[in-house]
């Protein structure tokens, strides 16, 4: 037998251009972060991390299937502040010196845009600092 799906005007097809009449929301991970943190690019597109200690972004989870994915990593300092960020080698920055300076004031908010270029290569844009 053959299964036939009834026509539904609200069905989205991956191989056709689609027009959305409502906002489309990317999945966002919101979490407290300290120590080694692994970002899951298969599940989430955006990340909101409240630093409760110094953070190292570890090798990310399975980004090979996410080539072309873009999003943001939002860093929020907790009420103490002075938290730092370091990166695994899969994360590449505009300068060889790493992610650059992030805000360290208590409750500061920074945004880092990213793009998955290929497996094991996530390009980070310049840090946009001190929102608020």
Predicted regions and their residues:
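Extracellular beta-solenoid/beta-roll
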Residues: 21-44
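Acidic, glycine/polar-enriched metal-coordinating patches/loops
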Residues: 1-7, 50-132
């Amino acid at each position: 037998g053959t299964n036939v799906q009834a026509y539904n005007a609200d069905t989205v097809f991956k191989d056709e251009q689609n027009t959305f009449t409502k906002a489309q929301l990317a999945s966002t991970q919101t979490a407290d972060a300290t120590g080694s943190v692994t970002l899951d690019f298969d599940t989430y597109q955006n990340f909101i991390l409240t630093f409760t200690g110094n953070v190292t972004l570890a090798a990310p989870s399975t980004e090979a299937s996410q080539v072309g994915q873009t999003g943001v990593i939002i860093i929020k300092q907790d009420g103490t502040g002075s938290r730092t960020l370091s990166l695994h080698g899969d994360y590449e920055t505009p300068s060889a010196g790493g992610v650059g300076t992030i805000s360290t004031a208590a409750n500061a908010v920074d945004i880092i845009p990213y793009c998955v270029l290929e497996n094991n290569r996530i390009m980070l844009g310049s840090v946009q600092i001190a929102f608020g």
